[in-house]
Amino acid sequence: MRVSVFAVGRMKSGPKRELVERYFDRFAKAGPPLGLEFAGVSEIPESRGQTAQLRKAEEAQRIHEALDNAKSGGTSSGGAALILLDERGKALGSEAFAAIVGRMRDDGKRQLIVAIGGPDGHDPALRSRADLVLALGELTWPHQIARILIAEQLYRAATILAGHPYHRS
């Protein structure tokens, strides 16, 4: 299963970018034996729309296109799964998150898209299409830190699925 991260906004060079790249690199190396291929990060420009509703709709359009492209791949399971990161989502532990990623893979999903929304959040139509709306705890995180956290959690999920001692339960 190809795993892609869609993030609204750009991450500038510096220590945060180096850290996120380190975790995505670890995930890219740990994932293939488990049937998980890291397909990269797609940075979506922040919308300049006049209203929050318009901005969310414009930002969601890129994610809808990626989902539609994956669905046209022709798998009977629908092709793609979508996880949205949102402070109002469901909080999970690392083992539960790993189990969900593993189940999506085992169900034959060709692609997993993890989406980090813009400052206004996610479009309601995109939220209704999501397989999981995930909170990274009850706190609100800046987008750069949310990207670091999901990179680390994807790597951690791979190590949990592999039985690697990185995660100590």
Curated annotation (Swiss-Prot):
The question of whether Zinc is a record keyword is answered with: no
Major site of localization recorded for this protein: cytoplasm
Annotated catalysed reactions: pseudouridine(1915) in 23S rRNA + S-adenosyl-L-methionine = N(3)-methylpseudouridine(1915) in 23S rRNA + S-adenosyl-L-homocysteine + H(+)
| Compartments where located | Cytoplasm
Q: Which cysteines are joined by disulfide bonds?
A: none
Instruction: List UniProt keywords, sorted A-Z.
Output: Cytoplasm, Methyltransferase, rRNA processing, S-adenosyl-L-methionine, Transferase
Give me the residues that bind S-adenosyl-L-methionine, please.
85, 117, 136-141
Q: Name one GO molecular function term.
A: rRNA (pseudouridine-N3-)-methyltransferase activity
EC nos:
2.1.1.177
A GO CC annotation recorded here is: cytoplasm
> Which SUPFAM superfamilies does the UniProt record give?
alpha/beta knot
Describe the protein's quaternary organization and the partners it interacts with: Homodimer.
Report the sequence similarity comment from the record: Belongs to the RNA methyltransferase RlmH family.
Q: Which HAMAP family match?
A: 23SrRNA_methyltr_H
What this chain does, per the entry, is described as: Specifically methylates the pseudouridine at position 1915 (m3Psi1915) in 23S rRNA.
Name of the featured protein:
Ribosomal RNA large subunit methyltransferase H
Q: What is the lineage of its organism?
A: Bacteria, Pseudomonadati, Pseudomonadota, Alphaproteobacteria, Hyphomicrobiales
